[in-house]
């Protein structure tokens, strides 16, 4: 724990120094013990980078991005990460966690800092492009592109019933960047969206999504508006 605190303090001091640099000077630092989640710093701008892979191009969706080996059958992207690292990176990027969706006694949408989700692609020619994540998602009822950004709901941390003294971050069960409302979501959309399989609101926009297995980088940028 003491080592982690020292590392966190060192990182915060580095971020403070980097924020004074020109925006053209881009730095990237790994967040967590394993590769997969990064904090990108360009002057005062901080963005979270998540290495991911395309796993679904057709059909209905509950997730935009899930953790590997969880909900790949209902998510466009998967990432082999610990979602706690993504949460920590968002905090370092200046996001404030709010609260997950509440279903009873009355519906309250997820809250928290607004987060813009983009996908960074590298073409066969080596050129890098970024497109809005919501452009890969189509509303089943209207046929139009998803018109909402995400919010940093922050998921939940509970005691592990099988290992006393251990904590569990519930978004690690799959709900990292959600399209259906889940009270375990790290990022959720702040509008009512069913998780009932018969009434899912969103589907993959197949023609816009690259082939299965394509490696991408998901970019999370905290809105300052």
Q: Could you say what each language-model-derived stretch is?
A:
Residues 22-225:
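Long, low-hydrophobicity ectodomains and other hydrophilic envelope-associated domains
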Residues 1-9:
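Bacterial N-terminal signal peptides that target proteins for export
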Residues 8-16:
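Bacterial N-terminal signal peptides
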């Amino acid at each position: 724990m003491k080592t982690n605190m020292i590392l966190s303090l060192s990182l915060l001091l580095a971020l403070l120094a980097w924020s004074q640099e020109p925006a053209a000077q881009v730095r990237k630092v790994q967040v967590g013990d394993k590769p997969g989640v990064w904090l990108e710093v360009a002057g005062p701008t901080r963005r979270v980078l998540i290495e991911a892979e395309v796993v679904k191009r057709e059909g209905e969706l509950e997730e935009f991005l899930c953790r590997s080996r969880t909900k790949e059958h209902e998510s466009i992207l998967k990432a082999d990460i610990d979602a706690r690292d993504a949460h920590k990176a968002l905090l370092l990027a200046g996001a404030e966690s709010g609260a997950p969706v509440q279903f009873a006694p009355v519906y309250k949408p997820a809250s928290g800092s607004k987060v813009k989700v983009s996908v960074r692609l590298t073409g066969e020619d080596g050129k890098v492009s970024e497109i809005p994540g919501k452009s890969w998602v189509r509303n089943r009822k209207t046929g139009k592109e998803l018109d909402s950004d995400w919010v940093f709901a922050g998921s939940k941390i509970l005691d592990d019933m099988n290992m006393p003294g251990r904590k569990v971050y519930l978004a690690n069960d799959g709900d990292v960047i959600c399209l259906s409302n889940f009270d375990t979501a790290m990022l959720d959309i702040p509008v009512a969206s069913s998780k009932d399989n018969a009434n899912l609101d969103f589907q993959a926009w197949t023609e816009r999504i690259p082939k299965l297995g394509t490696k991408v980088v998901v970019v999370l940028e905290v809105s300052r508006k």
